[in-house]
């Protein structure tokens, strides 16, 4: 895995995956789609979609644990703080051999710089919330969210997917 290349790819994902508008119905549609593909693939996940300060969708699939719920909360907090994908934040920290606590004074009890939370970006508004999954390795969590966003927004996932690790 090339961190610099992944960071460029994530920046392209964040630039492309913009909603023309986003509301509670959009959150429900996106969350239901994530739930269905996770269920079809037999994935044990927590799925959390929220605007900042307000939950919009939550689902816990068979086999997911309270730890997955807490990881989702912490990854979502990271997006809220940095307005970037939690995976991008983690990769940037990895590049500088730092942690959220070292570099930003953020407690690990409330923030996680691991893949799986992606900013919800509305055209003309900017980052309005996050969509998060937790239950897979962090790169796979990130990619599942990107795959679902591509499907919802009509983008070709193969053009936005991270390079194979």
Swiss-Prot record:
NCBIfam families documented for this protein: PRK02487.1-4, PRK02487.1-5
Pfam family, one: HbpS-like
Family stated for the protein in its record: Belongs to the UPF0303 family.
Species of origin: Paraburkholderia phymatum (strain DSM 17167 / CIP 108236 / LMG 21445 / STM815)
InterPro entries per the UniProt record, alphabetical: PduO/GlcC-like (IPR005624), PduO/GlcC-like_sf (IPR038084), YBR137W-like (IPR010371)
PANTHER family: PTHR28255, UPF0303 PROTEIN YBR137W
Protein name: UPF0303 protein Bphy_1660
Superkingdom as given in the UniProt entry: Bacteria
């Amino acid at each position: 895995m090339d961190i610099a290349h992944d960071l460029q790819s994530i920046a392209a994902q964040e630039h492309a995956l913009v909603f023309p508008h986003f509301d509670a119905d959009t959150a429900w549609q996106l969350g239901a789609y994530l739930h269905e593909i996770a269920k079809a693939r037999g994935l044990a996940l927590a799925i959390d979609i929220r605007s900042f300060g307000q939950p919009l969708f939550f689902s816990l699939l068979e086999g997911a644990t309270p730890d997955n719920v807490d990881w989702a909360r912490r990854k979502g907090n990271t997006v809220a703080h940095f307005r970037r994908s939690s995976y991008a934040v983690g990769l940037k920290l990895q590049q500088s051999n730092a942690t959220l606590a070292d570099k930003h004074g953020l407690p690990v009890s409330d923030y996680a710089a691991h893949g799986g939370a992606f900013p919800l970006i509305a055209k003309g508004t900017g980052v309005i919330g996050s969509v998060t999954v937790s239950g897979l390795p962090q790169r796979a969590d990130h990619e599942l969210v990107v795959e679902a966003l591509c499907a919802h927004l009509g983008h070709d996932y193969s053009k936005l997917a991270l390079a194979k690790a």
